[in-house]
């Protein structure tokens, strides 16, 4: 539902106006704190699920920022090379064509740190292929350790997931 404002009070007023709001069992949303606060106050028995699209978008955004930071250190020709795979880096590995894989292989041979960033992005995305919460939390925990040891640009992702872990992992109990 689209509301005129995104503030907590507007959301609370909307939730309070819903008929039979006590029958609402699950609310799906993005990671906007006022929404979470409003739902917890107005619908205390409802489970909040963070839409997986928003979670995966976070890591794609950080990967894109990392690529841009890397480009700042490179020549114009090297920047052009890396920027030529920008969309491919955001794609899921399983959806890549042979030509895209070949192009990435070449880029990775020159910029192994970009391969690390992509591989970690894909590992994170694969969390959503888990069939239950326990497996997802375990996979995330392993991923998080790897990030802390090997790739600091994704630390912000771990901080966000930790802050929203209940709502993110509720996805595995209510996969919407």
For each feature predicted by the language model, list its residue ranges.
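Acidic/histidine-rich catalytic cores and adjacent linkers
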Residues: 5, 12-49, 56-57, 76-176
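Short alpha-helix plus adjacent loop in nuclease-associated cores
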Residues: 55-76
């Amino acid at each position: 539902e689209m509301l005129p404002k995104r503030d907590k009070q507007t959301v609370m007023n909307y939730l309070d106006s819903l008929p039979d709001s006590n029958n609402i069992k699950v609310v799906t949303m993005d990671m906007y704190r006022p929404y979470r606060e409003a739902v917890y106050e107005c619908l205390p028995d409802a489970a909040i699920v963070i839409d997986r699209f928003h979670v995966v978008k976070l890591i794609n955004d950080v990967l894109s920022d990392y690529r841009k930071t890397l480009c700042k250190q490179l020549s114009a020709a090297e920047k052009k090379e890396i920027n030529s795979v920008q969309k491919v880096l955001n794609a899921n590995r399983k959806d890549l064509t042979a030509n895209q894989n070949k192009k990435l292989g070449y880029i990775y041979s020159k910029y192994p740190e970009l391969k690390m960033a992509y591989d970690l992005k894909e590992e994170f995305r694969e969390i959503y292929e888990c069939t239950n919460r326990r497996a997802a939390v375990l996979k995330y925990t392993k991923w998080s350790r790897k990030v802390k040891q090997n790739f600091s640009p994704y630390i912000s992702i771990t901080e966000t997931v930790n802050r929203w872990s209940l709502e993110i992992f509720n996805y595995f109990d209510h996969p919407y």
